[in-house]
Amino acid sequence: MTDVLARIPYARFLGLRTQMEADEMTVIMPFQDKLIGNPLLPALHGGSTAAMLELTAVARVALSFPRLRLPKPINVSVAYLRSGRPRDVHAQARIGKAGRRVAHVTVEAWQEDRANPIATLSAHFLIAEDA
Amino acid sequence: MIDPRLQEILPQLASAAAHTHALGFQLEGVEGRRVRMRVPYREDLVGDPETGVLAGGLVTALLDHVGGMAVWVAMNRFATVATLDLRVDYMRAAEPRKDLLAEAECFRLTRSVAFVRAWAFDETTADPVAAAQAAYMLDSDGGRGPGANLKGEES
């Protein structure tokens, strides 16, 4: 399998890594100082977390629907559940429904404890080649 | 009228955190309650190498940040704020090799929550790349203070 995220400049900027275990894909964002948005707490920038969630969704859709073009986001909705600590972030995506043109994806991100996610994303992507 | 103490730190609030600095965020200006920011185009911020279009995640990061700036302007002071949720509609791809701009306005401020709308564009707000609706929690550090996220236990 070719790693989609390795081809995306913004995913490289964030330092994202993909881990495959059977059919389960986990994306990891190793902690770097440049991901920090609040230096006092310190906490990850909401934009770091959101972008990582969205790229996890892109990678998941591209894995299930391999085609020439990358899936294009129509909209994304992010809920921030906990402040992101200066640690690695893990994320897994699930495709809830994929029709002819649109796929709906949910992604959950966590740090040490999978049971306590730091953020979730719900998104629609255009997957039709000619859309 | 913006409090001069807030006015003075607005450029830093726009671009001085590690993430906003790494992305190259810049404050363009404030007009009434509306804040405008810019991120200069860079190859390493691209989301699709085939087209050279900036990443959706970058658009989201800029909208999240300019929204927070609009909250500080509406509060007329600096406070710890945290995004509660953020929804972004991507209306069209950003033009390759063009800077990305964004504007935000906080249209309702309650004791705990700020409601914000924001737009991203490359030429004019009339032709947006994306639109966002977001809510922010105010004074969100809950008195935990500096270094709270470095403590071992889950808070």
What are these regions (language model features)?
Chain B
Residues 70-101, 106:
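Hydrophobic beta-strand-centered segment that forms part of the acyl-chain substrate-binding groove
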Residues 54-77:
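Active-site helix/loop of acyl-thioester processing domains in fatty-acid/polyketide metabolism
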Residues 10-32:
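N-terminal structural module
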Residues 7-17, 69-78:
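Short, solvent-exposed helix-to-loop capping segments enriched in aromatics
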Residues 24-54:
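Catalytic strand-loop segment that frames the active site of acyl-thioester-processing enzymes
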